[in-house]
A protein has these predicted regions:
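Gly/Pro-enriched, hydrophobic low-complexity segments
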Residues: 55, 71-79, 91, 97, ...
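Boundary at the C-terminal end of the N-terminal hydrophobic targeting segment
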Residues: 36-40
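Solvent-exposed, non-transmembrane regions of integral membrane proteins
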Residues: 4, 32, 51-54
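Solvent-exposed helix/loop surface patches that form functional interfaces
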Residues: 41-45, 109-191, 195-197, 216, ...
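N-terminal secretory signal peptides that target proteins for export/translocation
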Residues: 1-14
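N-terminal mature ectodomain segment of secretory-pathway/periplasmic proteins
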Residues: 42-126, 210, 217
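Bacterial N-terminal signal peptides
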Residues: 16-32
Length: 244
């Protein structure tokens, strides 16, 4: 890529990268009229396709939830890629592991590669806090901190989120849940809509199982949308309203 092309694209791509942090929205949800899936008594996997209103399909995102006697382990895989005219302009690959005991995060380990080499973030519960170590140093977050990752709706009480790619902490404001409907692959289903005010404006829809079926970040680059493509072990299908 020429220096000129890189300069012309750097601004929207930088904003797009920030927009991809929209996974924060479920990690900081307030209580609402949805059915809790926080207990995670059986294994489950959530697979999302990711699209951008300008760049089109840009990748996939998945969470695999594995309960055990000692708590819950969440394995996350992410792959994002932006191409224009057949030329790759941006990519991001990430693998992350969270370990939970009840509603407390006890450890976190993530590796993110945005094309400049892997960047590692680690965290562990210590006393009344959660100690996060990254390339930017070591900080202590509140014990209630949650990673920006939508694996269930048990993240109902924390307004503090951790960016999994950098380890940065952010405070957010959460709106009340609104009962509504949302279209997923042409099918209209009942859902609860939340709006979250952080560094970017976010919207998330949870179905009656408490599963985040869709979430969107909207900024001046356009909309980045995560849509649930497959949900393994999630229980009965959500209520459908109308036909495809």
């Amino acid at each position: 890529m020429t220096k000129g092309n890189r300069s012309a694209l750097s601004s929207p791509l930088a904003l797009l990268i920030r927009a991809l942090a929209l996974t924060a929205i479920v990690g900081v949800l307030a209580t609402g009229p949805v059915t809790s899936t926080a207990t995670a008594e059986t294994p489950a996997q959530f697979i999302y396709r990711v699209s951008h209103s300008t760049f089109g399909d840009i990748g996939s995102y998945s969470n695999t939830v594995e309960p055990s006697r000692d708590g819950i382990t969440v394995q996350t895989r992410a792959h994002f890629q932006v191409s224009m005219l057949g030329v790759r302009m941006y990519r991001e690959d990430a693998t992350r592991t969270e370990r939970w005991q009840g509603n407390r995060l006890v450890s976190f380990q993530g590796v993110t590669d945005k094309g400049d080499g892997p960047v590692e973030v680690k965290g562990e519960a210590r006393g009344n806090g959660f100690v996060i170590t990254s390339s930017q140093g070591t900080i202590t977050a509140p014990a209630s901190v949650h990673p920006a990752n939508p694996w269930s709706n048990n993240f109902l009480t924390s307004n503090t989120m951790m960016r999994p790619d950098s380890g940065k902490i952010e405070q957010v404001r959460i709106g009340s849940g609104l009962e509504t409907t949302v279209k997923i692959d042409g099918t209209t289903i009942a859902a609860v809509k939340f709006e979250i005010d952080g560094s970017t404006k976010y919207t998330v829809w949870l179905d009656g199982r408490g599963v985040p079926v869709k979430f969107v970040a909207d900024d001046d680059t356009g909309k980045v949308t995560f849509t649930l493509a497959k949900c393994i072990g999630c229980g009965p299908e959500p209520t459908q309203i109308g036909n495809r």
